[in-house]
Amino acid sequence: VVCVICLEKPKYRCPACRVPYCSVACFRKHKEQCNPEARPVEKKIRSALPTKTXKPVENKDDDDSIADFLNSDEEEDRVSLQNLKNLGKSATLRSLLLNPHLRQLMVNLDQGEDKAKLMRAYMQEPLFVEFADCCLGIVEPSQNEDS
């Protein structure tokens, strides 16, 4: 599996069409031509699968919850537990998240029906792009983007 733009090893998948990409720059190029209906069979299969419902467990350790979340994703889409902790420790990210507009965007994205459509729209907003770039900079510190 390779990035659809630069053919490097991918680290992410497009939320709309699930094609692999490796960086913010490649995602931006891809989203210009993204076709969310490119994989309708996969969407039908996923929607036909029963969703796993888990009973909330009281006093469950945060690390265990994060580990369970990580285990639910595809291998190449995973973010390491350490990188998730680094996101939580980032002063820059915390500062961005103090912005009420960004917080509302995040709530809308979390609660939205068509997350891919919302993601495409939000990636046009400079504040959201700054947030995404900040997250990627923490998760991929070796990647230096010209943005």
From Swiss-Prot:
Primary localization: cytoplasm
GO cellular component terms listed in the entry, alphabetical order: cytoplasm; nucleus; pre-snoRNP complex
GO BP field: box C/D snoRNP assembly; maturation of LSU-rRNA from tricistronic rRNA transcript (SSU-rRNA, 5.8S rRNA, LSU-rRNA); snoRNA localization
Zinc finger residue extent: HIT-type: 3-34
Binding-site residues for Zn(2+) 2, renumbered to this chain: C14, C17, H30, C34
Gene3D superfamilies per UniProt: 3.30.60.190
Tree of life domain: Eukaryota
Entry's Gene Ontology molecular function annotations: zinc ion binding
Keywords carried by this UniProt record: Cytoplasm, Metal-binding, Nucleus, Phosphoprotein, Zinc, Zinc-finger
Modification Phosphoserine occurs at: S72
Keyword Lipid metabolism: no
Subcellular location: Cytoplasm; Nucleus
Ranges where the record places region Disordered: 45-67
Binding site for Zn(2+) 1: C3, C6, C22, C26
Entry keyword annotation includes Lipoprotein: no
Pfam families per record: zf-HIT (PF04438), ZNHIT3_C (PF21373)
Family matches, as PROSITE patterns: ZF_HIT (PS51083)
Subunit architecture: Thyroid receptor interacting proteins (TRIPs) specifically interact with the ligand binding domain of the thyroid receptor (TR). Requires the presence of thyroid hormone for its interaction. Interacts with NUFIP1. Interacts (via HIT-type zinc finger) with the RUVBL1/RUVBL2 complex in the presence of ADP.
Protein name: Zinc finger HIT domain-containing protein 3
Organism: Macaca mulatta
Species lineage: Eukaryota, Metazoa, Chordata, Craniata, Vertebrata
Name of the coding gene: ZNHIT3
